[in-house]
């Protein structure tokens, strides 16, 4: 009898996607993050579902309902800690996944890359609305500051901000709709992830060398299922260490105080994974300019395929591009640090220089490095 997984209409799709999928024989651990992101998404949906059973999206009871989950619900503290730190793990995997794509030239699969950028934006939106739900001080003021940026849009800005708020400020209507968004968006992310995979399987995976791997493929199972399982062990180890030993390490102490519109925290800042973009926003002393720079810092990923000038796909054999890539990485870490600092010297000038370097590297220096490397490869005699 022919194997059921190869004939059954549904199992056949799963088989072609995760079992008999031909994969390059040389993909490294940097290719683990796709599966880890899928697992992060499942963890977030499951923990979020159980949290939603006990959470109330009302300004009067939201904060105390989160406290109730942590104190009175069976293993509620664990669910909350896994969900909060799961978001951090999600973004860690996302940044590494995008970094891998830039380093090895995976962005040349344009459809897969563009869906990936849309996924990144959707995950960022989900994390933002989710951070508002506990209704602590930083939740409230973070929501106020970021949604207020919409008012910088000429002509329609104020109307747009009030439409999002459902009133004249962040209040009960805002919290209720943010809870609704936070519930639905992960399912939209799941659908987008399936489309992302669909486009990826049209072309097959890239590999570290950037050379067409069609002549040397191996089945995904058991080789890469085992490899992904190892990655999963590391992910769960770090997540559990965070959730069980220092669950509040990455959070903000201000969020232990209930939201108070009459008392502004000394330093309003988002979660660590938004700090790089927040630093770019703050580095421009103009509201609309800052908003445009914030958008550009993420949307610039969409034009990376158009800026590829090198004859080789991967950076594996391109030392100048490699150097610039690691300067970009260090620059993003610097921006993340600056985003968490108060708006005073020397942080202002460091942030402005780092923001300028970020755009310079992607738009000018990396394409020029590609052209120079092409020139260096040509025989000179």
Curated annotation (Swiss-Prot):
The keyword Plastid does not apply. InterPro entries: Cyt_b/b6_C, Cyt_b/b6_C_sf, Cyt_b/b6_N, Cytb/b6-like_sf, Cytochrome_b, Cytochrome_b_C_euk/bac, Cytochrome_b_N_euk/bac, Di-haem_cyt_TM. GO terms for biological process: mitochondrial electron transport, ubiquinol to cytochrome c. A ubiquinone binds at residue 201. One of its GO terms (molecular function) is ubiquinol-cytochrome-c reductase activity. Heme b b566 binds at residues 97, 196. Component of the ubiquinol-cytochrome c reductase complex (complex III or cytochrome b-c1 complex) that is part of the mitochondrial respiratory chain. The b-c1 complex mediates electron transfer from ubiquinol to cytochrome c. Contributes to the generation of a proton gradient across the mitochondrial membrane that is then used for ATP synthesis. This is Cytochrome b. The lineage of its organism: Eukaryota, Metazoa, Chordata, Craniata, Vertebrata. The gene is MT-CYB.
């Amino acid at each position: 009898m022919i194997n059921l997984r190869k004939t059954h209409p549904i199992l056949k799709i799963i088989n072609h996607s995760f079992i008999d999928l031909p994969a390059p024989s040389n993909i490294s651990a940097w290719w683990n993050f796709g599966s880890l992101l899928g697992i992060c998404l499942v963890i977030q949906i499951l923990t979020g579902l159980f949290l939603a059973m006990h959470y109330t999206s009302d300004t009067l009871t939201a904060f105390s309902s989160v406290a109730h989950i942590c104190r009175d619900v069976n293993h509620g503290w664990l669910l909350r800690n896994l969900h909060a730190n799961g978001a951090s793990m999600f973004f860690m995997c996302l940044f590494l996944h995008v970094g891998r794509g830039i380093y090895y030239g995976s962005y040349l699969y344009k459809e897969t890359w563009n869906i990936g950028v849309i996924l990144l934006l959707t995950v960022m939106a989900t994390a933002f609305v989710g951070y508002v739900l506990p209704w602590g001080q930083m939740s409230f003021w973070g929501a106020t500051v970021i949604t207020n940026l919409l008012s910088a849009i000429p002509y329609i800005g104020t109307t747009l901000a009030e439409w999002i708020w459902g009133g004249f400020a962040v209040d009960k209507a805002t919290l209720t709709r943010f809870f609704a968004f936070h519930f639905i968006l992960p399912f939209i992310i799941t659908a987008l992830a399936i489309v992302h995979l669909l486009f990826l399987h049209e072309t097959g995976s890239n590999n570290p060398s950037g050379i067409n791997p069609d002549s040397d493929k191996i089945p995904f199972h058991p080789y890469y299922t085992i490899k992904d399982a190892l990655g999963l062990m590391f992910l769960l180890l770090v997540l559990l260490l965070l959730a069980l030993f220092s669950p509040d390490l990455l959070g903000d102490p201000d969020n232990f105080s209930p939201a108070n519109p009459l008392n502004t925290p000394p330093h309003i800042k988002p979660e660590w994974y938004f700090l790089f973009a927040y630093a770019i926003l703050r580095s421009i002393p103009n509201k609309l300019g800052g908003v445009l720079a914030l958008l550009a810092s993420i949307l610039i990923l969409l034009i990376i395929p158009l800026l590829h000038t090198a004859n080789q796909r991967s950076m594996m054999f391109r030392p100048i591009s490699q150097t610039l890539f690691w300067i970009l990485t260090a620059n993003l870490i610097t921006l993340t640090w600056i985003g968490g600092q108060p708006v005073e010297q020397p942080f202002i000038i460091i942030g402005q220089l780092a923001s300028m370097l970020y755009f310079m590297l992607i738009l000018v220096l990396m394409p020029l490095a590609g052209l120079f490397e092409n020139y260096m490869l040509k025989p000179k005699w």
